[in-house]
């Protein structure tokens, strides 16, 4: 299945708003939040639902735990997902949990470990698999490759797809004092499954991809430039806390749609503007 149009990350806290949207073309759900049944509000949407992991730790030196792969596979089957995805990151090492996504050293040794873990995960899933670029608040001193080279090598060796997080491209470029457009074009854009976009903010001189703030205008401008050449990837909004009033969330969805040249999905809700 080829994804298209505008979607949103499904979260229980905003499920009532999502239920009134004018047919988002897809949703994404956090795999670890799903148990043995589909939440009724999610099932009622009647749209494709992507299974998205946050705890596989693909970039760890240890093999991905089989129980976590099995849970992702069961969730993808339960949801009828067309696709499953996870981050190029590690979240644990030596049995210790970091509690958040950490960047992987961009080295050939790390690529070998990632390829093993991604291949193991891919082979254990009933659906295609995609990996996502993360926002990194630091780089490792022994990095050997650019982010574009790193991602391209991983994807070429595993054959998986890319979840292109446009906000993370912006975050990394800003924090590394690089040009976001140049960095975006260094990624393996021919392997995109779908795109993420989210908000963030500056703290202590660093841009943080918070998912709890509005999308900054430069991120929307990067999206506009990316889609201006005729690209029409599926795009979804991530929001993971500090949920705004319904009208603000609808306005943000409209801003994404307008920036990417996509159809709006906010008409006819009880909160919609006249």
Model-derived features with residue positions:
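Acidic/histidine-rich catalytic cores of soluble enzymes
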Residues: 125-206
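Acidic-and-aromatic substrate-binding clefts and catalytic sites of carbohydrate-active enzymes
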Residues: 13-17, 29-41, 57-67, 137-145, ...
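Active-site acidic/histidine proton-transfer and metal-coordination neighborhood
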Residues: 68-162
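Gly/Pro-rich active-site loop or hairpin
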Residues: 63, 101-105, 111, 173-232
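C-terminal helical cap(s) of enzyme catalytic domains, especially alpha/beta-barrels
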Residues: 243-273
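Boundary/entry segment of secreted carbohydrate-active catalytic domains
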Residues: 1-20
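Acidic (Asp/Glu)-rich catalytic clusters
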Residues: 18-22, 35-51, 64-82, 121-124, ...
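Hydrophobic faces of well-ordered beta-strands that scaffold small-molecule active sites
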Residues: 4-10, 25-29, 49-52, 84-86, ...
């Amino acid at each position: 299945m080829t994804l298209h149009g505008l979607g949103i990350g499904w979260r229980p806290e905003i499920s009532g708003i999502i239920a009134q949207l004018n047919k988002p073309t897809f949703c994404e759900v956090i795999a670890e939040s799903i148990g043995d049944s589909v939440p009724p509000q999610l099932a009622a949407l009647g749209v494709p639902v992507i299974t998205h992991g946050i705890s596989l730790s693909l970039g760890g030196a240890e093999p991905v735990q089989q129980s976590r792969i099995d849970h992702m596979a069961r969730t993808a089957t339960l949801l009828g997902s067309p696709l499953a995805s996870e981050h190029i990151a590690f979240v644990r090492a030596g049995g210790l949990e970091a509690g958040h996504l950490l960047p992987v050293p961009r080295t050939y040794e790390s690529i070998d470990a990632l390829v093993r873990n991604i291949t193991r995960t891919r082979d254990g899933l009933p659906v295609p698999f995609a990996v996502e670029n993360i926002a990194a608040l630091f780089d490792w001193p022994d990095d050997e490759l650019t982010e574009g080279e790193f991602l391209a090598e991983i994807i070429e060796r595993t054959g998986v797809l890319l979840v292109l997080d446009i906000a993370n491209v912006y975050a990394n470029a800003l924090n590394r004092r690089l040009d976001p457009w140049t960095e975006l074009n260094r990624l393996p854009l021919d392997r995109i499954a779908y795109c993420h976009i989210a908000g963030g903010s500056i703290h202590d001189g660093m841009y943080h991809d918070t998912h709890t703030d509005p999308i900054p205008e430069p991120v929307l401008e990067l999206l506009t430039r990316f889609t201006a050449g005729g690209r029409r990837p599926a795009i979804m909004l991530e929001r993971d806390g500090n949920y705004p009033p319904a009208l603000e969330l609808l306005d943000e969805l409209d801003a994404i749609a307008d920036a990417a040249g996509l159809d709006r999905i906010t008409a006819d809700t009880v909160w919609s503007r006249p």
